[in-house]
């Protein structure tokens, strides 16, 4: 930085033995992927979110160490105030586990967990509309329950259910006709995954709902009443409790019954450096820092506390599109 202008960047070898200065004629674009793979930084900034996580899995972005965000802060930029992660609801745990140590836990990934089956807390009560975006349930649970894990409940009719649910984007288990999405598991592949997780002890398969409650320590009386009420919503095709769409309701009546213990898993951090519509980093006076541009998960001013994935590929689309537009801007 020369005066108030960013004019280049320094780089080094992995060992830090050799440093290189790179001069930038038109500006520096920061795009290092956020800080999801930096345990110290994540736990310092997102300790409250971490209470509801069993893992942090920055797919394909294992160098997301926060270097770009820190460099921008050193240059005088400011960061979003509220910590935000892209949290999915697919972290599966053993019955004896609880979330809260996302960088130190043994957990699994369960794709089917996003399907809108009945989900209850340790008290045996529903938490929210199970057809909501991935992290809505996690945030609702934090305000409702004594435990930051929940339980996914389904019965032997699940193959029909997941086809009727017709979820889209990365939650889809059934390939849509005429689409170019990469092949999901389908019914056969999902059945194999369920069987494997039953063998691992992460999914409980039982002949009665009472056995399900006992396996996880769920309040049995309340749980059985919740299932009865939920079956009534299915029969009436009307969820008077949370307003879930009728086609995403399911009955839980036909053994064998299945259940698993779930919590959140973070894929990326989304709180970054504040930018303007030209992708320029902003200082504490909301003024652009000349020569400094930020895109991708290093950039902020977009999400706030939640990842509302009401459109498939929302964050991937933002990163790709903003990268293209920023490139044009700087060029």
Segments predicted by a language model, with ranges:
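Internal hydrophobic alpha-helix adjacent to the cofactor/substrate pocket in enzyme cavities
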Residues: 69-78, 216, 224-227, 316-331
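Glycine-rich loop(s) and the adjacent beta-strand/alpha-helix scaffold that form part
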Residues: 15-18, 22-94, 316-319
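An anion/pyrophosphate-binding glycine-rich loop and adjacent beta-alpha core
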Residues: 69-215
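Short, small/polar residue-rich loop motifs at catalytic or cofactor-binding pockets
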Residues: 112-114, 267-269, 312
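A conserved short coil-to-beta-strand element within the FAD-binding core of flavoproteins
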Residues: 1-6
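Short, well-ordered coil/turn residues at beta-beta hairpins
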Residues: 12, 24-25, 30-32, 122, ...
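A glycine-rich dinucleotide-binding beta-alpha-beta segment and adjacent secondary-structure elements
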Residues: 208-211, 216, 222-306
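Hydrophobic alpha-helical segments, especially N-terminal targeting/anchoring helices
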Residues: 13, 120-121, 275-276, 282-283, ...
């Amino acid at each position: 930085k020369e005066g108030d202008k960013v004019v280049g960047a320094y780089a080094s070898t992995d060992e830090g033995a050799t440093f290189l200065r790179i001069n930038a004629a038109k500006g520096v674009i920061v795009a290092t992927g956020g800080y999801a793979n930096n345990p110290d930084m994540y736990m310092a900034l997102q300790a409250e979110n971490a209470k509801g996580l069993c893992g942090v899995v920055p797919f394909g972005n294992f160098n997301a160490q926060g270097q770009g965000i820190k460099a921008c802060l050193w240059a005088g930029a400011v960061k979003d105030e509220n910590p935000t992660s892209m949290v999915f609801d697919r972290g599966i745990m053993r019955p004896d586990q609880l979330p809260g140590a996302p960088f130190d836990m043994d957990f699994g990934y369960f794709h089917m967990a996003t399907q809108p089956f009945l989900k209850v807390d340790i008290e045996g009560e529903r938490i929210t509309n199970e057809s909501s975006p991935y992290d809505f349930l996690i945030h609702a649970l934090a305000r409702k329950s004594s435990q930051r894990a929940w339980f996914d409940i389904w019965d032997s009719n699940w193959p029909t259910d997941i086809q009727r649910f017709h979820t889209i984007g990365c939650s889809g288990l059934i390939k849509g006709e005429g689409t170019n999405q990469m092949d999901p598991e389908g019914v056969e592949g999902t059945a194999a995954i369920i069987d494997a997780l039953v063998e691992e002890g992460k999914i409980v398969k039982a002949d009665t709902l009472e056995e399900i409650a006992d396996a996880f320590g769920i309040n049995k009386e309340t749980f059985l009443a919740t299932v009865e009420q939920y079956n009534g919503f299915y029969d009436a095709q009307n969820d008077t409790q949370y307003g879930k769409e009728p086609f995403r309701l399911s009955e839980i009546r036909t053994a064998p019954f299945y259940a698993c213990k779930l919590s959140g898993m973070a894929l990326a951090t989304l709180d970054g450096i504040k930018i303007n519509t030209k992708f320029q980093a902003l200082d504490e006076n909301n003024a652009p820092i000349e020569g400094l541009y930020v895109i991708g998960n290093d950039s902020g001013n977009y999400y706030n506390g939640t990842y509302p994935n009401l459109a498939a590929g929302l964050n991937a689309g933002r990163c790709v599109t903003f990268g293209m537009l920023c490139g044009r801007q700087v060029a």
